Amino acid sequence: EIASCLVGSEMCIRDRPIPVPGVMSAILISMDDKYLYLNNWLHGDMRQYDISDPHNPKLTGQVWMGGLLGKAPVINGVKIAGGPQMYQLSLDGKRMYVTTSLFSTWDNQFYPEIRTQGGAMIMIDCDVENGGMKINKDFIVDFGKEPNGPSRCHESRYPGGDCTSDIWL
């Protein structure tokens, strides 16, 4: 178990010489402008905030999917390596697809196990009525099992459109 403490907005991890920031590499607002999503690549969590009142955002969902804090889930026998990085939200806001590789050099530095294990894509079920997030335990794309792998996954696109690009039919 990794001991951690909070220093300001950064996490302090026993085996790291300095506080560890979350490293938010992306931010997303749902199509209905109700929810804001962000990732913390080093901490390992995805967050959902209700921004119906933009001056008073409320944390409504949080899931852990890797990261340096030792909270990596096992999904269908696959332990997640890396941290939440790129993500795509379906147009209805109910499904979020999250990948775990940011940049291979950084991946190797912070998550050396990703070299041999490979990356993954998971699906998070998002409650658009009440807020909340839950990792879908029936969905995983294990890029460690790819031919000529292990491979890493960075960005995906949602067929028919998604909330994070200007692609929709």
Please identify what each model-predicted range represents.
Residues S9, Q48-T60, Y111-E113, M123-N136:
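Short loop/turn segments immediately following beta-strands, especially the blade-tip
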Residues W41, S101:
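Short loop/turn segments immediately following the C-termini of beta-strands
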Residues V23, G83, Q117, E146:
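Beta-rich catalytic cores
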Residues D32-K34, D92-K94:
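Short coil/turn segments that connect the beta-strands within blades of beta-propeller domains
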Residues S9-E10, R14-V20, T60-I80, N136-L169:
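Surface-exposed loop and turn segments in beta-propeller and other repeat-based domains
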Residues E1-G8, C12-I13, S25:
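Single conserved hydrophobic/aromatic residue that forms the stacking wall/gate
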